[in-house]
Amino acid sequence: GNKEWTTANIPKVVGGIDAASTAVAQALYEQIVSTVVPVSSPRVAEMVKLLENTFRAVNIGLVNELALMSHRLDVDVWEVIDAANTKPFGFMPFYPGPGLGGHCIPIDPFYLSWKARQNGFESRFIELAGHINAGMPQFVVERVVSALSQNRKPLRDAKVHLFGIAYKPGVGDVRESPA
């Protein structure tokens, strides 16, 4: 799904149960990938992956909330994102959509949140992003119904074509796709 970043050039984080197992994992992955990042334990390696995926989910939730807000304020959220992206530092663009999809982004943040609850910590930010993202398919449907109504087209007579139902461009994987 990404021509620039492949298995070979995406850094691989490894953490073994001790220094020897970390070294073995590192030696194995160095045969396949260009950069291996050793960490102190499997727990740290797992938390790295959870952070990466939760970061995406939370930022998608933020931009989805901005899309909802911009719709109410009659502001083009895409123009806002494009203009904000001209700042050369401190901004990373995320784009609104029908929610989260794929085999890890929709799952990992909620595993992390569940694990936090198991240890007496409430991760409100992650849960809120999940709530916002979970509501996006309904928002998309409401927008379609509204567009049909504005064009005096009854929903029951409408033919709506869905394009791009995979969770990201360039892939055929529809796991957890909100579309």
Q: Which residues make up each language-model segment?
A:
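Structural/interface elements that position substrates and couple domains in central-metabolism enzymes
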Residues: 1-179
